[in-house]
């Protein structure tokens, strides 16, 4: 556990706690002051009715009312600070829990679990305690989907150069965000109270863009007519006050404005109100994210490009907020009459909406996609910050399987994890034997999950790891499916069939298998495993296979230079000693009988 980082999170959480005490005390003072100033204003109004020549009391009442409005504004701002501090306190506490091994405060990504995926099911990428849950700090459903998509990518495409360039760019982005702690916490705090529902936003924005209005509102002459009408209206007021025009002229003109604007625009304005109201809270969340991103300077090419793609988004969402504010201003009968008479507000709202629709129709989806990626990158950067024991991998450009690891271990294990050196050569196969619980499966998962991290530009858990770009497929956790009448053995065959179907001769592949054909008898399992490995060895494939079948290790003698034996050995004595170190050779000791004797006769052990 990173003690310095833990101390930092504790310090920040305590700082927020102290700030909250101060802000809440201030809030109570503001409330009492608001009540007092409002009562004082009423008192001066009462004095005005009781005293003669008491015009001064009206000025005092006005002053008290202005003071009330000032304090009210301060109270609103103070309340925002309280909400921000509460959110940050929750963020810091969540990170403290994470460093202590408690991930319950983060979504596990159960919806992304897919037993048919080439590797995510076997590598514990999703579900409780998974890599996703440890990494996920997204504040939007779209960001969560984007992070899941990154962790589920199937590599090995023919566009190797472009993919390698993107991975290296991602490494720089992740490293930069991993050092941007104040930014990370502030970003994460924006999703504490309520996550942004990206699907709802996209659906509502689609409805917004599809909404059509009569050609009348698109006519440029309408704009000039409105300008001329309002100019004439205000001039009539001035002339009426000066006695140069009939006193009723402004009144009748105002009534005309109200009728014209209300009858022409009210129905359409209500449609706009309903459309925008659907996304108001979500858009407000995106607006806060955009303000934070836009005020932050980034150095990496990927982050700068993302920020550039978001140009205009903040202004766009602010305009939506402005339209909604104008709708709120005319939300009662008095507002409807006043704002339509003096500003033709219903027509103005429709025209503002049309202008927004025309200006930003083609860009909103791109902005949402960019924000989703930014959201996912913040989670990756936060993982980089928390896991400072990890290092960035070296990406090889060779068009073959390259996997050279120095002191590699599984990221889910503590810092006391036993690390292993291991090198995988292209077109070669590694048979790993060993007793139960000796470390075979954990080692296989260490190979797979660290490759997954490297391909996403994330730090790996090793002193050094050099990998190339290749297709990864695993078969470690096959399950039966009684609902569809699929037995365990049949499920294994289907998994191997899917493996074969995923292979391409022009793309190097690494397969990681744990106990092939577990669902059959020992001899059949051995013969079937040999047959499968003999066939697969003719393809552009490299493999690491864990097995209890010691006979399978004889393939090293039959295919010299192609098959290699490695093992996790145990020492049997009064107790069992597990080294968890991989060595060359074939395992000599097994522990099933030893452990079973301990269960049947506990006094023996």
Where are these regions (language model features)?
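Alpha-helical coupling/stalk and coiled-coil linker elements that connect catalytic or binding modules
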Residues: 1-435, 443-472, 494-495
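ATPase nucleotide-binding head domains, primarily ABC-like/P-loop NTPase cores
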Residues: 380-383, 387-605
